[in-house]
Amino acid sequence: MPRPLALLMAGVLLIFYLDGFVLGAALLPLLAFALLGLLVLAGFLHHGDHGPIGDLHPRPVLIAAMGALAVLALTRGAHVSVVLAAALVGCIGALVERLSRGTGPWRDGAAPLYCGAFAGMTSDLVVRSPTWVLAGGALAGLLLALLSNSWRGIGGKLGSTAFMGVVLTGLLAGAFGALGSGAHLHAFSAQERVVLIAFALLSPVITHVLSFRWDLGVVLGSALPSFVVALIAPVPLAAVWLGGSFVGMTAPDRLSRYPYPSLLAMGLLFGLFSLGFEPRLAGIGGDLGATAAVSVFAVLGTKALLFGRPQ
């Protein structure tokens, strides 16, 4: 991959990490997050796999914009929860792709549609105008095409790409005074924290089994259980399940022959990161995916430093 795009990916992830976990943290959490940040960096260097630039094509851009538009219509129009909306769009995209049987415009449309859906989860307290969110979804689709040879098999790539698209579009929206003050973060109770950790541990494993053992594919493996959980769980906890499912989208060749200890470690980190997430501007679409990617890179970085790449 050309260096500017590699630096852009690293830069956006760094900004996300600093804003979400480091800035304003007390001393002990600050030291812990700083150490974890070094492990994330090690994982990024060992597993970023920045290959050549991907092919430019309007199809993923349009499909991602459709995903963002669908979630916007469901959330801001029909007042469906953002988790339920994104999961529903992901399920539909994955099923349509499977029905296309590898031909036609939807032969690989599930990933860009899901990526665009994450951009569409952006809160109206962050970006008020749906037009800017739609532009962020389209940009996410463009970036996904350009970055097709990077982060292959890394859980959280789709969400991180959506986050990048929304942030870059948000910078332009801010210049036009269209940026809000940010959404309010949910304060988890003691009981909710227990459920949060349980969800963060279970979701990656279930997603990984559905995606790779049952061969449903990563989009349906993530979206289907997330849709079910979103029907029965409060939105903040359903969001944790959805984010944990992104961890489970990590490909087997990124893990060892025994993937589940790594997935549990990644899920636990995702849960802890979710509890410590305090960004200056909450509610940006794709932040769950970026948190998942940070968790995946941290565990992969630890394993790379201790044992080298997976055997």
Task: Pin down the residues of each PLM region.
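C-terminal transmembrane helix-loop-helix hairpin of multi-pass membrane proteins
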Residues: 1-42, 53-65, 71-72, 77-87, ...
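Glycine-rich, hydrophobic membrane-spanning regions of integral membrane proteins that mediate transport
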Residues: 48-52
